[in-house]
């Protein structure tokens, strides 16, 4: 039975990928195709902005709840500072990857595979991650107000 469900991708066993009912489903293909890394028509800076917004927003929570300042009054600020530090490190790593992977003046059909395109992606990532980290901090600091708005307290 497993032989019928799991087979080589496109019938080629040398690709190194298996076709399964999950990986070949239309839902999974649509989901992955809509991720910013694979979506058609996005400029590198918009890809970076979208990826950065997602990462900056979810980086703050673990630092607030699990970080060394989790039981203090300044846990949110500590989470913000730690998140900013991690965003700076990630941006430096993205920039270093772009410097060593793509040659200046190189041409490619994919703008993300050029030095200029990767630089734009990195800039977008930095702006998006920093912005969403500050949004997450603002929401955590003003949680009672936001909760009141959502539960209809101010109607």
UniProtKB/Swiss-Prot annotation:
Keywords: Membrane, Photosynthesis, Photosystem I, Thylakoid, Transmembrane, Transmembrane helix. It is a multi-pass membrane protein. One of its GO terms (biological process) is photosynthesis. It is found in: Cellular thylakoid membrane. The keyword Thylakoid applies. The chain crosses the membrane at residues 80-102, 117-139. The keyword Amino-acid biosynthesis does not apply. GO terms for cellular component: photosystem I reaction center; plasma membrane-derived thylakoid membrane. Belongs to the PsaL family. This is Photosystem I reaction center subunit XI. It comes from Thermosynechococcus vestitus (strain NIES-2133 / IAM M-273 / BP-1).
